[in-house]
């Protein structure tokens, strides 16, 4: 009996928009509440004995056979909401507990769970990343021409200039998708747009059939990945320039899965199913849970595995639960897990105190009508109430703050913009928003409701000290506009989730960091205080923003190297990454101290070098099976991920997977092997350079790799041993090894945990 075991996905990542709502990931609701008597369940089943079901009608018939006979003959609204084909063997249905119990007794039933309701997590970057129109990777990849990027998000804004198809040919013949917008809305850029709303409708009765973006997040991420060139882009007069996505000539396929605050799991599963069926090349998922489940119960991991098997590259947000360790999500090794970094552009608003001190902060709203004269300065929390310090709604006394510059603290679960709205309601003239200690020097440029600036925690402490030092503190804000050239960029954003990787400690995560702070991209509607209703853009922050940067860059590599596997593209991105900032120093974090590998992974993406990496660490789909068996998963659990019946006849430790980085739990000595494939010059030679982690001896054999043809493979081994010379109290140490030729540097980070 040959069973095809596909478990339904607990669809991991959705997103929380990173604008005024801050950068923290929200709590995920564990299950939906459609009615008091029924819920939507994801049902996982096997295939029928001795049969291969490939046609949609056959699958639907099989799935319906699991329903109780009374439901089969019922004239009520159909109980089966979705029948899945590509990413799992199963269906979504609205059932009572009694009806579910009947389903569970059927032969072929595997498991079921209530669907989870998830919530969204949330111009200059091409130049910052070295992308130029007349040379380099853009030209070499033909700007991503012919590649299809599927974006699962909140929809799209058709007609926005970022989605113009000027100069873009029709989609390739393999495209099978459709456009559910009006006949003129889709074009050669926006080739597909669909809404998956059946679960949302069942839950709240709302009909939202059109894939129109109603809040901006989906439009922003889609244009970041593959927006067309748009001249004169700006936000309230700031960040002026030419806006463009990472792959400006790539096609976009939009799958709307979020309606209001709800992104139902079964709707997301249907969108993933469709994206694989439609023939996309890249899937971009700016979504995230607060904690990563094991891979066999991780919807993103399972869906991404199915996509990877078909040659589809999957890029996912790392999550916004930083800077805390072990907060990383989307940690499967077949996913590119993307953290967030700053760029070298700031939109500067300086807090100037009455004693002459100045502290640079950021704000998008910089009204020319604001006169920078010194005004009375007051701390919002002077009454000792925490809610006042956070400038919570209704917490400020109008008489105490009218006409003053008000110092508010970040946090309290209150959006940054909402704090400014409270200051404005109380009659305040301006706001200085100070960071909390956790976010330290990580700042966001927001469209505030009044003149404002967002300053660091250190600056806030000094401003508080000044307020306490005088009976008549004063301050103003100096708006300095857009400033390019911050030498500390790229730096890791405070909110960017960190490793270690809980589901698989032997795989270093995140894989890469990319631009995710104060990112300008398309927006559906004008912002408050905007006078231009035609060119609508907004600035957002989050790993939701860094993910589509890497999705677009992957599309460029796919265009340049159409025969590369998803693992080869991922390897090229990782081994070519930058580890120093524009000031030629090590990349720092929100504390301005050199960061560790759990924040950066391999480093910051460098598209030009990724397009010509020299060597790649390739992995074929079947190579993951012994790795998964080595995690201690049962054969059934591995089969859930692999979409077929599995025998764990062989298993390998995590470190033996042919991954472009090393994450080693080291007690006694360990030896791992790696195989690299030459994708550079046919005749080339690579020498070894090792920076061993403190307290670790690293031996590599051989120490020289010689190639005589393209696609030649060479294998090397690495032995890690403790030396006893390190700090006996340290838990982790880090280093790297790299293979260097006359043209290429192929770098792999090394993270060691002492056990």
Curated annotation (Swiss-Prot):
It holds the Pfam family fn3_6. The keyword Ligase does not apply. Its main location: secreted. Residues 376-461 form the PA domain. SUPFAM superfamilies: Subtilisin-like. Glycans are attached at residues 182, 297, 325, 393, 468, 529, 706, 727. Induction: Rapidly induced in roots during development of arbuscular mycorrhiza (AM) upon colonization by AM fungus (e.g. Glomeromycota intraradices). Also observed in root nodules that arise from symbiotic associations with nitrogen-fixing Rhizobia bacteria (e.g. Mesorhizobium loti). Its EC number is 3.4.21.-. It comes from the Eukaryota. Residues 128-611 form the Peptidase S8 domain. Residues 41-119 form the Inhibitor I9 domain. It is found in: Secreted, Extracellular space, Apoplast. InterPro entries: PA_domain (IPR003137), Peptidase_S8/S53_dom (IPR000209), Peptidase_S8/S53_dom_sf (IPR036852), Peptidase_S8_Asp-AS (IPR023827), Peptidase_S8_subtilisin-rel (IPR015500), Peptidases_S8_3 (IPR034197), S8pro/Inhibitor_I9 (IPR010259), S8pro/Inhibitor_I9_sf (IPR037045). The active site is at residues 153, 217, 544. PANTHER family: PROPROTEIN CONVERTASE SUBTILISIN/KEXIN. Belongs to the peptidase S8 family. Required for arbuscular mycorrhiza (AM) development during AM symbiosis with AM fungi (e.g. Glomeromycota intraradices). This is Subtilisin-like protease 4. It comes from Lotus japonicus (Lotus corniculatus var. japonicus).
